[in-house]
């Protein structure tokens, strides 16, 4: 499978992709460089597809990739409900795309490049 090195060794690259995919699931929108967004898009699409399947094996595969971070905290009837990124993926994000076959993300280019190195910046968001 072809992939971009992104100027990092394999462990750093995998950690960065895991973190950015988790942030995309939690916030549903991230601002990053164009090449990073194209790589994160691949992993995010795979995680949402696993979420659509919803079986135990898919949950375990997604849990092995998505970081265990708190996505949402709110109160319901005298109880505090804490939802993790994995729970949000399977209960909120994946059901939204049950009738869609792929293409769960959108990349929109920003007009202004990054100030330090003029890298092209984009917004990666869930459709």
From Swiss-Prot:
Single Gene Ontology MF annotation: structural constituent of ribosome
Keyword Lyase: no
Keyword Ribonucleoprotein annotated: yes
Disulphide linkage map: none
GO biological process, one term: translation
Regions crossing the membrane: none
Keywords, ordered alphabetically: Ribonucleoprotein, Ribosomal protein
Cellular component, GO annotation: cytosolic large ribosomal subunit
Subunit structure and binding partners: Part of the 50S ribosomal subunit. Contacts protein L32.
Family indicated by similarity: Belongs to the bacterial ribosomal protein bL17 family.
Protein name, as recorded: Large ribosomal subunit protein bL17
Organism field: Lactobacillus acidophilus (strain ATCC 700396 / NCK56 / N2 / NCFM)
Record lineage: Bacteria, Bacillati, Bacillota, Bacilli, Lactobacillales
């Amino acid at each position: 499978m072809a992939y971009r090195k992104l100027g990092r060794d394999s462990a750093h690259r995998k950690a960065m992709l895991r973190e950015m995919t988790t942030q995309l699931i939690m916030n549903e929108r991230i601002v990053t460089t164009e090449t990073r967004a194209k790589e994160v898009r691949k992993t995010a699409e795979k995680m949402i597809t696993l979420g659509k399947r919803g079986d135990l094996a898919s949950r375990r595969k997604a849990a092995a990739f998505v970081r265990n971070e708190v996505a949402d905290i709110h109160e319901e009837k005298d109880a505090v409900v804490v939802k993790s990124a994995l729970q949000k993926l399977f209960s909120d994000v994946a059901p939204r795309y049950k009738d869609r076959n792929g293409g769960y993300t959108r990349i929109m280019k920003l007009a202004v490049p990054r100030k330090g190195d003029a890298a092209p910046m984009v917004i990666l968001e869930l459709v």
